[in-house]
Amino acid sequence: MKIWIDADACPRAVKEILFRASTRLRVPLCLVANRSLAKHAGPLVESVVVADGFDVADDYIAEHAAPTDLVVTADVPLAARIVAKGGVALDPRGELYSEESIGERLAMRDLLSELRDTGMIQGGGPAPFSMSDRNRFASALDSLLHRMLRR
């Protein structure tokens, strides 16, 4: 088992929770980004910097993640790719992507994108990351990792 982080947009608090979980449970962790990331101590932490470009980090994660791995991402299309190949994906706010929910999440993402593109709605994006988001993620991660490690 390995934890993959779509690191470009992952909140720092989520990364810190993941580093602690990786160390505590002795699970390898890989951050993937298209820019250099701060160094993180620990023999189980790896950073991969991919070329700059649309979906390059997502493609790397989708190609390298195994069905026994956990992918942490806010990117719904990447999560859909992981779930389609039998993998496990969790968003940084603690919501598990599933075969049942991924279609609806993709449709909502596409609808909101289209509405923004046509000017029917302004702004967009999620609310600022909060302490309750952090706590929800930590709780979901803990139960998910324990369940995955028991397999």
Curated annotation (Swiss-Prot):
It comes from the Bacteria. Coiled coil: none annotated. InterPro entries: UPF0178. Belongs to the UPF0178 family. PANTHER family: UPF0178 PROTEIN YAII. This is UPF0178 protein GSU0171.
